[in-house]
């Protein structure tokens, strides 16, 4: 276990995930390539996880670790909806993931997630949660994974505060595709979803 703590390279993930928030809703986009080091383990990996009709998350890190945490969030969302007759706040999901990851120390989960959605408290919102349990609200956009440096450049250049949801879809797709051109850990196509108050979770053609 000390090797994981002492060598940051072990924590690098071969993927690109992007989240963009607009006044209309949120957009999540990812590539499809699943890697294990320099080995391409899968070419059609699904890296967007539907938590509820109003919430979803991107997956970056060790697949089993991320899946375990997102299963927990899915159960939390279901139980919250049954108990309160309302959708769980996105901040509650991010905070719960943060607590799970923080208290797993020293055996940390290798997971980095963008959790996004639309709720009654904050409207369209994005949170990022890393493997140490830190979580932050992202006011405009976020990217994780080995392709994120390239994706951030595209996002910084193209984001506008007044952009439409359709433009955000195009921007997120462009950011992931740019990362795929420069990052060997990313590739095989782009998956995109949107979440709005009116339509909820919806898969979009990239």
Curated annotation (Swiss-Prot):
PROSITE patterns: PROTEASOME_BETA_2 (PS51476). Pfam families: Proteasome (PF00227). It is found in: Cytoplasm. The formation of the proteasomal ATPase PAN-20S proteasome complex, via the docking of the C-termini of PAN into the intersubunit pockets in the alpha-rings, triggers opening of the gate for substrate entry. Interconversion between the open-gate and close-gate conformations leads to a dynamic regulation of the 20S proteasome proteolysis activity. The active site is at residue 15. It catalyses: Cleavage of peptide bonds with very broad specificity. Residues 1-14 form a propeptide. Its EC number is 3.4.25.1. InterPro entries: Ntn_hydrolases_N, Pept_T1A_Psome_bsu_arc, Pept_T1A_subB, Proteasome_sua/b, Proteasome_suB-type. Keywords: Autocatalytic cleavage, Cytoplasm, Hydrolase, Protease, Proteasome, Threonine protease, Zymogen. Its main location: cytoplasm. GO terms for molecular function: threonine-type endopeptidase activity. GO terms for cellular component: cytoplasm; proteasome core complex, beta-subunit complex. It is an enzyme of class 3 (hydrolase). Gene3D superfamilies: Glutamine Phosphoribosylpyrophosphate, subunit 1, domain 1. One of its GO terms (biological process) is proteasomal protein catabolic process. Belongs to the peptidase T1B family. Component of the proteasome core, a large protease complex with broad specificity involved in protein degradation. The 20S proteasome core is composed of 14 alpha and 14 beta subunits that assemble into four stacked heptameric rings, resulting in a barrel-shaped structure. The two inner rings, each composed of seven catalytic beta subunits, are sandwiched by two outer rings, each composed of seven alpha subunits. The catalytic chamber with the active sites is on the inside of the barrel. Has a gated structure, the ends of the cylinder being occluded by the N-termini of the alpha-subunits. Is capped at one or both ends by the proteasome regulatory ATPase, PAN. This is Proteasome subunit beta 1. The gene is psmB1.
């Amino acid at each position: 276990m000390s090797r994981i703590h002492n060598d940051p390279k072990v924590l690098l993930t071969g993927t690109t995930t992007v989240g963009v928030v607009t006044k209309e809703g949120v957009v999540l986009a990812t590539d499809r390539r699943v890697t294990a080091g320099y080995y391409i383990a899968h070419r059609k990996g699904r890296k967007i996880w539907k938590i509820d009709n109003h919430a979803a998350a991107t997956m970056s890190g060790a697949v089993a670790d991320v899946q375990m945490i997102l299963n927990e969030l899915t159960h939390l969302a279901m139980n919250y909806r049954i108990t309160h007759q309302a959708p769980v706040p996105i901040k509650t999901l991010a905070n719960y993931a943060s607590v799970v990851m923080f208290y797993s120390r020293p055996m940390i989960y290798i997971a980095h997630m963008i959790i996004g959605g639309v709720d009654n408290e904050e409207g369209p919102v994005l949170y990022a949660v890393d493997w140490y349990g830190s979580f932050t609200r992202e006011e405009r956009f976020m990217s994780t994974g080995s392709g994120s440096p390239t994706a951030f450049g595209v996002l910084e250049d193209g984001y506008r505060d007044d952009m439409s949801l359709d433009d955000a879809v195009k921007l997120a797709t462009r950011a992931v595709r740019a990362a795929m051109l420069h990052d060997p850990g990313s590739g095989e196509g782009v998956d995109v979803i949107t979440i709005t108050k009116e339509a909820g979770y919806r898969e979009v053609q990239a």
